[in-house]
Amino acid sequence: MTDNLDKNYIIALDQGTTSSRAIIFDRDANVVGTSQREFAQHYPQAGWVEHDPMEIFATQSATMVEALAQAGISHAQVAAIGITNQRETTVVWDKETGRPVYNAIVWQCRRSTEICAQLKRDGHEQYIREATGLVTDPYFSGTKLKWILDNVEGARERAERGELLFGTIDTWLIWKFSGGKVHVTDYTNASRTLMFNIHTLHWDEKLLDILGIPRQMLPEVRPSSEVYGKTKSGIDIAGIAGDQQSALFGQMCVEPGQAKNTYGTGCFLLMNTGDKAVKSSHGLLTTIACGPRGEVAYALEGAVFNGGSTVQWLRDELKIVNDAHDTEYFASKVKDSNGVYLVPAFTGLGAPYWDPYARGALFGLTRGVKVDHIIRAALESIAYQTRDVLDAMQQDCGERLSELRVDGGAVANNFLMQFQADILGTCVERPKMRETTALGAAYLAGLACGFWSGLDELRDKAIIEREFSPQLAEAEKEKLYKGWRKAVDRTRDWEDHDA
């Protein structure tokens, strides 16, 4: 518990794919200080993505100092630090020197594709799915770690001698901030490694054997809300969650059936399924989320590949808008899309279709179609894809969506939010506080150290800026959605490939 009433602030460290951020919250969950620093992206080969772990730590440390200075407060006034992070990104370091043996291999990196293919050939795909809730894909940490051990000179031998440690970004930051005293991760991050059994809540010995990972290099796995240790300056480190799970908690989606959508370049949808690890029949991931006090809960996760990137395409390639914000104005100028559907399968289709050979297409063109209709169809495509995933989630878990909570850059678009409510037939809630990912980490840390009393107090702080209620008649809604599904079907299996 917090023993000093003068400790009136929580720091959330939000370590993302392109930048490190620090956000300071007061007891009312208001932002009182922020700082952000970008860091270098390294692309040594096509499909490879790396970060320098030392640069990640340096930028994250600097943002904390800068945010404190901006807020005009000292370390002594901070009750705790919460950490949220880009998930799956993999770091291996020497536990004596604290130096990485190789750059961090980023979640986007595809270098372990052949390792995944071999796992499938060896018949491990089904067990991986059942134990971890994940698909056998280079996205996740386990095959990245295997690649480092297999390809960095001396790494496997040193790991087997107990000289090297593994961690996702949360683990790396805590180890550095604690001066090498604490080697932990939380259940949400562990559930993204392809090495953690989400049912037993332990590292899976069979998977470690399959991947050839020495058990002693893995961190201890702990709940998302507890005091793990202290920084060298004496601040409690008290909350950890992967970025999407942190946003789910920041949105107070802690009961079964509650869901959030983060509208970014793509869209990340998570639905809380409570204490039930639901196995998806629709290609969704089963993952660990945070329960009411940061304990283990489960969630279904689905990703839409092209959300905000569709609007970027209108702006940068077609050049029919100058600014993403303008799309709301143009889409609202026409009463509907005039029968036009844009399926933005630029890189294939994600959940629930999983068709890498689908390609983007524009349907329903007539001489009466204007640019405004195409812009509107682009925004509508984001909402349609969200419904695709949420329908799959509801079918998988049997939970009816109570409302959809939203965050990310595109939620400022009122047209999109209203159409989202219309096509779902469900209320869409946009929070006043847009920093939901950082807020989730702050909440987890604050609950652990007694800064906030519990869920009721946090719910009181969850102010909805605007609720979008469905306004479309059921028959019209289903007619529009039927057209979308027809359009999607026409894009499937488009690119030539070997059967």
UniProtKB/Swiss-Prot annotation:
| Catalysis performed (reactions) | glycerol + ATP = sn-glycerol 3-phosphate + ADP + H(+)
Which residues are involved in binding ADP? 17, 21, 265, 308, 409, 413
Q: Which Gene3D superfamilies match?
A: 3.30.420.40
Enzyme Commission number, as recorded: 2.7.1.30
Q: Which UniProt keywords apply?
A: ATP-binding, Glycerol metabolism, Kinase, Nucleotide-binding, Transferase
State which pathway it belongs to. Answer: Polyol metabolism; glycerol degradation via glycerol kinase pathway; sn-glycerol 3-phosphate from glycerol: step 1/1
UniProt: ATP binding residues: 17-19, 265, 308, 312, 409
Q: Which SUPFAM superfamilies match?
A: Actin-like ATPase domain
Q: Where does glycerol bind?
A: 87-88, 139, 243-244
Give the first-level EC class, as a single word.
transferase
Known regulation of its activity is: Inhibited by fructose 1,6-bisphosphate (FBP).
In alphabetical order, the GO MF annotations are: ATP binding; glycerol kinase activity
Per UniProt, sn-glycerol 3-phosphate binds at 17, 87-88, 139, 243
Summary of the function given for this chain in its UniProt record: Key enzyme in the regulation of glycerol uptake and metabolism. Catalyzes the phosphorylation of glycerol to yield sn-glycerol 3-phosphate.
Q: Which NCBIfam families match?
A: glycerol_kin, PRK00047.1
Family membership noted in the UniProt record = Belongs to the FGGY kinase family.
This one is known as Glycerol kinase
Query: What species was this sequence derived from?
Result: Pseudomonas entomophila (strain L48)
List the lineage, top down: Bacteria, Pseudomonadati, Pseudomonadota, Gammaproteobacteria, Pseudomonadales
